[in-house]
Amino acid sequence: MRPDDPSLLRDTEARVLAWCEQAGLFAHGQRVAAAVSGGADSMALLRILLALAGRLEVEVSACHVNHKLRGAAADADEAFVRGECARLGVPLQVCRAGEDGLPLAGGGEAGARALRYACFERVHAGGIDRIATAHTVTD
């Protein structure tokens, strides 16, 4: 089966739907934000959540954290996420390190994690019930 085979996507959606229902991850009407970096794993998560939103009975949005650690590359990731969310019609909240009271992402992984958690807390306080994250097998 090729990665772009539509049956692969349907199979993946079916597995995710079954897992979400079995685990009781979402309640009717909940607002779910996909945490998206712009990478393949998180963008796939966003697309799958959008495809399943009706069956899961959830409202889907996205959030993105710009850690500002990689200069122009971080800004390019943010621009990509903004563009994709606009194209898909997905509400997006962007958190940027050192802005709007958010911490800087210094201090390596611990600092980056602290920034992500601060962003997720802000998103949750804004009315989002669940934040979904995606990781590849090698993460």
Model regions and ranges:
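Core alpha/beta nucleotide-donor-binding catalytic domains of modification enzymes
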Residues: M1-D139
